[in-house]
Amino acid sequence: MSGTLAERIQRLEDIEAIRRLKYRYMSYADDGYDADGIVSLMTPDAVWDGGEAFGRQEGAEAFGNMVREVGKQISFAAHLALNEIIDVDGDTARGQWWLLMPCTAQNDEGKDEARWIFASYDDRLVKRDGQWLFAHTIFDVKTFCAHKDGWAEA
């Protein structure tokens, strides 16, 4: 870590702020998929790309609408963000996390079942008016499987 002591402290404070931002995102998702709360953590023009599993949403409001729909299908979720790597460069940053998420989601017949999601997040963030916000997220689902089947069968 190079730079003055003040720059190094600022970088550490930024890393902690980004970590807390991600945890707020996860908490809003775990609290009934609070779309308004999640959107408040994003730039208005944010992009959220969930690939084939969840699609690409351009703009925070579009993502908020998708979150509301997901919330209708997932009645319980515990978003566990793990193994973060956060790199800060001035007012921009990149954060990477693994997601382990046990949840209760509707199956193809519309019945609730215990499921697992294993995925990765690759976030680009910007600092605006002293606040870190998500600007671009790639959400890469590795598996979304029924608990009883396990991920080896999915």
Task: Please report, for each region that a protein language model flagged, where it lies by residue.
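Short, low-complexity N-terminal intrinsically disordered segments enriched in polar/charged residues
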Residues: 1-35, 40
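A near-ubiquitous, low-amplitude feature marking generic local secondary-structure context
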Residues: 1-4, 8, 21, 46-50, ...
